[in-house]
């Protein structure tokens, strides 16, 4: 009896690149893709973390007795 071999391709997710047809060098083509572009991370703590805008704009919680028509 012959054992069935599981292929590794079935479990892997396939990335749909935006480079069209890759002809020569797949690694260099994927490095130029939008997935590997440089991103600026926002500071969460420290000097550059101050945000001028409110976290939840437009959500003002008032007491219901102020709303008389």
From Swiss-Prot:
UniProt KW RNA-binding keyword: yes
Disulfide bond listed as a keyword: no
An MF annotation (GO) of this entry: rRNA binding
Function statement: Rescues ribosomes stalled at the 3' end of non-stop mRNAs. Recruits release factor 2 (RF2) to the stalled ribosome, helping position it correctly in the ribosomal A site so its GGQ motif can hydrolyze the peptidyl-tRNA bond.
Biological-process GO terms, alphabetical: regulation of translation; rescue of stalled ribosome
Designated name of the protein: Alternative ribosome-rescue factor A
Upper taxonomic lineage: Bacteria, Pseudomonadati, Pseudomonadota, Gammaproteobacteria, Pasteurellales
Quaternary structure (record): Interacts with the 70S ribosome and release factor 2.
Keywords assigned: RNA-binding, rRNA-binding, Translation regulation
A Pfam family that the UniProt record links to this protein: ArfA
Family: Belongs to the alternative ribosome-rescue factor A family.
UniProt xrefs under InterPro entries: ArfA
